[in-house]
Amino acid sequence: ILEAQTEENISFVLTDTAETCEKYPFHFALHIGYELCKNEVKVNWTVENTDTKELYFSIGAHPAFNCPVHGEENKTGYGLKFGGLADTIHHHGNTPDGMAVMEDKVLALKDGCVTFTEGFFDECTYMVEGKQTGEVSLLDREGIPYVTVKFDTPLFAVWSPEGKNAPFVCIEPWYGRCDATR
């Protein structure tokens, strides 16, 4: 439901209903706001507990960004820059059915950057926990950032569908993730 709107801002609210309570038995109000500020879009989530019992939830964004952007056939040579990092980032992957695999893996970086090679996304998803960075940029083949996602979440994921040469990369800030295999 539209909550408020100005020329630069818009906000929506989702509240629990009898139908939502069938699958998610909690009373809540989810407020999502968008603000245009020069060449940025700022997104704000507020999860409000409208009950007296504890509210369990996870929330995350699912933005996808065009890649490649200059008419190339694939993403090879494009890349990512992880703000504030230099040599490595720790991550883990997931199973084909979406379960997290908690085996610690290290992605080598050069000056905080990694370049996409053929098969880079064959692991499907790079899940990064522990607030290792709060900024991820997509880089074109010249190493120039063309989109940057800034966030203050405990984890994020970067992925593109494996083996499909999909024309996008997702950079997803998350509060919570899928369950893990053991």
What are the roles of these predicted feature ranges?
Residues 24-27, 57-59, 162:
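Short glycine/proline-enriched turns and hinge-like loops at secondary-structure junctions
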Residues 34, 41-49:
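Short, well-ordered beta-strand segments enriched in hydrophobic/aromatic residues
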Residues 54-56, 64-151:
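Active-site/ligand-binding surface loops and adjacent short beta/alpha elements
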Residues 1-38:
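Extended, loop-rich substrate-binding clefts of extracytoplasmic carbohydrate-active enzymes
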Residues 42-44, 62-64, 168-174:
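Active-site scaffold segments
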Residues 18-19, 85-89, 98-100, 169-182:
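Surface-exposed, gly/pro-biased binding rims or lids
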Residues 10-12, 30-32, 43, 59, ...:
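Hydrophobic residues positioned within well-ordered beta-strands of beta-sheet architectures
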Residues 145-182:
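Active-site pocket scaffolds in enzymes
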